[in-house]
Amino acid sequence: MKKQGILNSHLAKIFADLGHTDRVVIADCGLPIPDGVKRVDLSLRIGEPSFLEVLDVVESDLVVERITIAEEILTHNSTIADSLKERYTSIDMCSHEDFKREVAKAKVVIRTGEATPYANVILHAGVIF
């Protein structure tokens, strides 16, 4: 049995297989997930687990080169937006409609119980060297 890191076997396998620039989405409970994109649904009930709780765990296991967020988060969810701006220096922004199209390019979408507007992020994998 693993003693540290991600215990979820699906996520551990996906993360081990990621390459440079591969995409991982952490999503609120309302983001539509395109057919054909792997999903790991962690949602238990509204608000649990939260977007930031999941992001904290994923960040501890994944090298993130940059992120992409929907520009609407800046005006509709300043709490999450501020947290993302504190964590990352390389942030791409696009409209929410464009964001949803970009989700189709992800290796996995991790669905949380988050129920606040636009609490979604695309993490672009970096390299450890």
From Swiss-Prot:
Record carries keyword Cytoplasm: yes
Active site: H20
Pathway linked to the protein: Carbohydrate metabolism; D-ribose degradation; D-ribose 5-phosphate from beta-D-ribopyranose: step 1/2
UniProt gene name: rbsD
Source superkingdom: Bacteria
Protein name: D-ribose pyranase
Keywords noted in UniProt: Carbohydrate metabolism, Cytoplasm, Isomerase
Positions of substrate binding: D28, H96, Y118, A119, N120
Subunit annotation: Homodecamer.
Record-stated family: Belongs to the RbsD / FucU family. RbsD subfamily.
Localization in the cell: Cytoplasm
Organism per entry: Exiguobacterium sp. (strain ATCC BAA-1283 / AT1b)
Enzyme class: isomerase
SUPFAM superfamilies: RbsD-like
EC number from the UniProt entry: 5.4.99.62
Biological role: Catalyzes the interconversion of beta-pyran and beta-furan forms of D-ribose.
